[in-house]
Amino acid sequence: MMKRRSLIKAFALSATVVSMGFAWSAQAADTIKVGIMHSLSGTMAISETPLKDVALMTIDEINAKGGVLGKKLEPVVVDPASNWPLFAEKARQLLTQDKAAVVFGCWTSVSRKSVLPVFEELNGLLFYPVQYEGEEMSPNVFYTGAAPNQQAIPAVEYLMSEDGGSAKRFFLLGTDYVYPRTTNKILRAFLHSKGVADKDIEEVYTPFGYSDYQTIVSNIKKFAAGGKTAVVSTINGDSNVPFYKELANQGIKATDIPVVAFSVGEEELRGIDTKPLVGQLAAWNYFESIDNPTNAKFVADYRAYAKAHNLPNAATVVTNDPMEATYVGIHMWAQAVEKAGTTDADKVRAAMAGQTFKAPDGFTLTMDQTNHHLHKPVMIGEVEENGQFSVVWQTDKPVRAQPWSPYIAGNNKKPDHPVKTAQ
């Protein structure tokens, strides 16, 4: 039997631990935990690290104005390291151990698909800030990036137009995973509907982290000998750097073979001599070069944040589309929490419908009433010598997302509201 003195000691210790526990949980309740889940290492770090940085800046901005529901937001940053199964583990950790009220994260669709069952099982909320292939509408995700009809389809329509070079043949080049393959399936069906034959469509995929583009670029040149050709690039991550370097090495100019990219923005061009790429294209819903007061403040705030926090290459930081979508998403979530009066996922989900926010893209963006996607303007930009983009085409107003593409058979029977996807 335990001696009486030991018992008293043990009881005193457990009482201290319990009271410490209460103090900790009370302290934790003074803040609202917010998960930030982006790859800060591995092949996707080039693209995802700035999303973590802009998320922290946005949280600081909200906290400086008093936080949400009178509480400060407390960021919890995790690094899933471009490792797709690790994303699911980190998501579970954020929701169960860290008790995050919401998570802002992911870039690749394979990372989003990895975490989706976790968010649906635990009824967590994920804000996903990157353009993607559609074919998904989860009640546990808000998609603040573009669906194919808000990026891919308009970009290819532009390439086929006189202004875009009247392309007749299409070289679809992507990283080998769900986003490029599904997007290209949609684009192939779209091109068929416009009378483009399979012989005039080439599809090539490379692994994540791929760097030897010599043969592929040489094949693009051969394919282009058969008629006016455009390249549609869904290459993701740091592979973009060697791809664009190889285009320059082989003397491919935008006037000969235009390349439109869906995952290359200002950040990916930071490490490249952009002079040989002048005139090449990217389709997004925001560019840093957009001239309006809201964007001027967003860009200035981020530059100041980078300097104050000694971010790597702070003197040359840029903003881009997924950063803007992250910024908009965090602000919309904060507004929805204020409206709901709670961080409860079901109540916040309901409060998100119809939320609006004046975005740096120059438009007041609306979260759709039913489909969990943002209405977004579509823009096509040309690379300039300084690594920025000049907008050469854009819609005159935001476009409603079509997560279920009409170019995929059977989609017309799918509901226009979220349904759990994970089994």
Residue ranges of predicted features:
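Signal peptide-proximal N-terminal region
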Residues: 29, 53-75, 165, 193-198
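Extracytoplasmic "Venus flytrap"
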Residues: 35-54, 78-85, 107-110, 176-181, ...
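Extracellular/periplasmic Venus flytrap/periplasmic-binding protein
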Residues: 89, 140-250, 293, 297
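Extracellular/periplasmic periplasmic-binding protein-like sensory domains
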Residues: 247-327, 338-341, 395-422
